[in-house]
Amino acid sequence: MAFDFKKECKELYKPASKPSIVTVPPMSYVAVRGKGDPNTEGGEYQNALPLLYGIAYTVKMSKKGSRSIEGYFDFVVPPLEGFWWQESPSGDIDYVHKDNFNFISCIRLPDFVTRDDFDWAVAEAATKKKLDFSAVELLKVDEGLCVQCMHTGPYDNEPATVDAMHEYTTELGYVPDFSDTRLHHEIYLSDPRKCAPEKLKTVVRHPIKRAE
């Protein structure tokens, strides 16, 4: 049975529809950075997706090739994730002006993936997929203390969920803790190409700290 992060780490991938506080452990990702409206056909975001999945599936399918990865176990490729920000000191996201988005689009990798394994996967995927994988990176993220919530509905309706998260943490004595490395985080549990907008499920996560 392939290891499924969504099922084994439910506190990270299946939070309640009401806000909750969680301490997120360090993780590794295959990631691509970019800018612009994620809905733009042929834009940086759309072009990043085949690169991410190309690396993730190359690692997963290494069991059938010549590469022997130490500590390997079969796994279900985790859901697509994204870290988003705009040039705003507060860390607030303006969903109207999507052209101003900066993003790190990413997919979680198992902890057994080393730098050497990652570099091998990049070279292997580039050979097989005939794509330019120079934009991908092995990203280490340590989110730590966060508030999160399951958002159901269109992405543009996320501000209501974010407001509920902020109200919840304020009542408990926490404040937002955005920085260059602590960002608005989304985990996409639904495929927008196959799911009605009102049924989309997205984990929304924000960094927090104790109020001084």
Task: Give short role names for the model-derived ranges.
Residues 1-212:
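A solvent-exposed interaction/effector surface
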